[in-house]
Amino acid sequence: RITLTNIKDNKNTHNIDFHSVTGQGGGASALTVLPGETKTIEIRLLYPGTFMYHCAFGDVPEHIAHGMYGMFIVDPEKPLPEVDHEWAIMQSEWYLDELTSDRVNKLDHIALLNEEPNIITFNGKKNALLNENSLSMNTGERSRIYFVNQGLSLASNFHPIGSHWDLVYPEGATHSTNNTIHGSQSTLVVAGGGTVVELVARVPSYIILVDHALTRAFYKGAMGIINVSGEENKEIFEAKVT
């Protein structure tokens, strides 16, 4: 059961399209709510995986560009194997114009139309997974990342610098009959799509998570850090001093 309330102080009509839901508009039609309204749907989730949800009323690109989206994880009937860490990461695009008097950015409609975001983030803002917000794990541990590319326009080239995706569930589809990939360097995640990836911390290092269209990482913000602590493993990596 999903219930959506649009508080009475809002000025606009909204709804939610759940990519995990089978039904008109992913539930959006039945969940369209005017300010002050509440609506409910009853659903059965047919497929496990990592899904996007977003507002799908009116100017849908503009609503997504304003951050009206999220991640919806559906566990498979047979649970995935236990891991040491599980993290959820969303990639987002921001099409921002000048600040208003109340220091809120306006939406740049021309940049949105041309699919040219000036900021691309992990988990909603620059540095959300950097510095004191970095992720951490120890050598020998395995981490699972549930990843959704909210778009709304660009595909993501999700890559761990200094490591590999030990296991990939392509497109985030975790049904037990689906094939997985072992030892991938990067995995492609389309706009509005997802993936589930796992990595193993084999040596102490900083694993840098990026969209490997690297201007997005180094200039626009799509970057995160996993801080790996523990004992060195010289059979895997050793820096020689000359």
Can you say where each PLM-predicted feature lies in the sequence?
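Copper-binding active sites and cupredoxin-like electron-transfer domains
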Residues: R1-T242
